[in-house]
């Protein structure tokens, strides 16, 4: 049996996830963005805000690579400004959805070559776009863990609770 999950489903899920995070962060305040990423990190991202900027800048840069554009420098996007981060995220998402909408069907499975850090990689746009979305999902899960470990109660972010692919969640009344 084949079950199809499209890139559009993953985009819809990550759009929902971003809205959920933005709403939660606005309620908590920008201090959450300064929470440290932990002592065992690799040193690239020192705070929740820096990890969020990385989510959005990675998306933008993968679109840049697939579009043959110069790589976006995201260093000027402040990592301590909720609205600024999500505005950058809206811009990167607009570019990704435009790429998905306009990339010809015949090009989705044709490998492209580009530089990634200190390597030259050769991958299909399909793989790069799926990776970009899974990369985001993975990092939001890391952020959820970090904020929980720092005493914040978060929202449910599981795909199951999202509106994507339908379904319904009804909470039962607690019985005393």
How would you name each of these model-derived features?
Residues 68-108:
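Helix-adjacent hinge/juxtasegments
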Residues 105-118:
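Carboxylate-rich helix-loop segments that flank metal/cofactor sites and access channels
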